[in-house]
């Protein structure tokens, strides 16, 4: 199992978020303030340090947490490629906001004024992403080590457990809040899974994501990461599209590779791209609709 093409190709929102998180963590780390970014009852309800709500969403409190956190954020870029940057932006906002709200409610219930009860970092987004990871990403390889069964997904779970236990209860609580937020998104509360930002908002992240870094197109097709799509799915996608016009532009190998890396049949991906005039997002929607029939 892998996360598709290497780098942040077709994942500009993830790229912007990872860079922002790294910069904030390094900035506060240099100042020696990273360990003070965690949320506490005193900060929020007595001193009204509302700015900590925002900073705690991006900056990790230690180097080990930063390493495991960025690794997981980087891997979960696969979901942006699956649903598109616009909907993934909604997922980030929803999971982060709901998780943060749950953390504030937790602080108000515990009323512990002695220390920072909750560690900082994008725990909401990371652990919300484990919901689609568990439900949508199939196991492609299984193996045994000293009689214990493992799969290719085990490494992601182990990284998540390490991050969850990195600060004991200070990190466990934010992780649980993230899992709850991801579950609510999965349940499509208030139709959130259909929500989209205006296009200019989604494209804003693309302009922030420093195109010169990590956006090179993949040189060759990648392995299927979301399960093998049956040939029937490919044929359904082909039948669902009218014959392309003679003047249609031949799909680029880069676009075909991107769709194949998302788990679609190569022939179906090519037909969808022809119909969508080489628009990867539109082709993805066509293929998803074909699968639902």
UniProtKB/Swiss-Prot annotation:
PROSITE patterns: UBA. InterPro entries: Peptidase_S54_rhomboid_dom (IPR022764), Rhomboid-like_sf (IPR035952), UBA (IPR015940), UBA-like_sf (IPR009060). SMART domains: UBA. The keyword Transmembrane applies. One of its GO terms (molecular function) is serine-type endopeptidase activity. Disulfide bonds: none annotated. Keywords: Membrane, Transmembrane, Transmembrane helix. Residues 214-251 are annotated as: Disordered. It is a multi-pass membrane protein. It is found in: Membrane. GO terms for cellular component: autophagosome; endoplasmic reticulum; membrane; phagophore. GO terms for biological process: defense response to fungus; heat acclimation. Probable rhomboid-type serine protease that catalyzes intramembrane proteolysis. This is Rhomboid-like protein 20. It comes from Arabidopsis thaliana (Mouse-ear cress).
